[in-house]
From Swiss-Prot:
Role of this protein: Plays a role in cell envelope biogenesis, maintenance of cell envelope integrity and membrane homeostasis.
Gene from which this protein is expressed: yciB
PANTHER family: INNER MEMBRANE-SPANNING PROTEIN YCIB, INTRACELLULAR SEPTATION PROTEIN A-RELATED
Transmembrane segments: 3-23, 24-44, 49-69, 76-96, 121-141, 149-169
Keywords, in A-Z order: Cell inner membrane, Cell membrane, Membrane, Transmembrane, Transmembrane helix
Keyword Transcription attached: no
Record-stated family: Belongs to the YciB family.
Pfam families tied to this protein: IspA
GO cellular component, one term: plasma membrane
Organism of this sequence: Cupriavidus taiwanensis (strain DSM 17343 / BCRC 17206 / CCUG 44338 / CIP 107171 / LMG 19424 / R1) (Ralstonia taiwanensis (strain LMG 19424))
UniProt protein name: Inner membrane-spanning protein YciB
Predominant cellular place of this UniProt entry's protein: membrane
Amino acid sequence: MKFLFDLFPVILFFAAFKLADIYTATAVAIGATVLQIGWVWFRHRKVEPMQWVSLLIIAVFGGATLVLHNETFIKWKPTVLYWLFAAALLGSVLVWRKNLIRAMMEKQVSLPDPVWARLNLAWAGFFAAMGVLNLYVAYQFSTEAWVNFKLFGSMGLMLVFIVAQSVWLSRHMPENTQD
């Protein structure tokens, strides 16, 4: 259910684009993200840092799209977000010697240190590549194709990557020995 809640602004963006245009969809995405953050704050009295970053990016890039009436800005938004994720994953290791993937998952999964390092690097690489792919689709295809890619293509690739990571991780997880 949380996954669908996290997709709420993207789904509304897609629907608004299909019913109207990119500018209406952008305004809807900004409003939906504000509502989403408001709901999270109301329910939990806490908003995760990445949710604040996402709100800031949609407000800046979406706002620029609306004010300047130029869809290029909203098309850059996913790339900026992906590249920030990649930079955070790499930067946390290089600067603070902290593996963010490990910090998020180590309570659920026990893995050797080298596997954590490769997993962090794999996710950083995935996000960097997704940023490049988003730009490729944004500049080489129509706005409609980009909107479809934003919802279906990027989510599909994310799902495939998660499944591949799960299969790879299963080889490195300690086996449960029950007597």
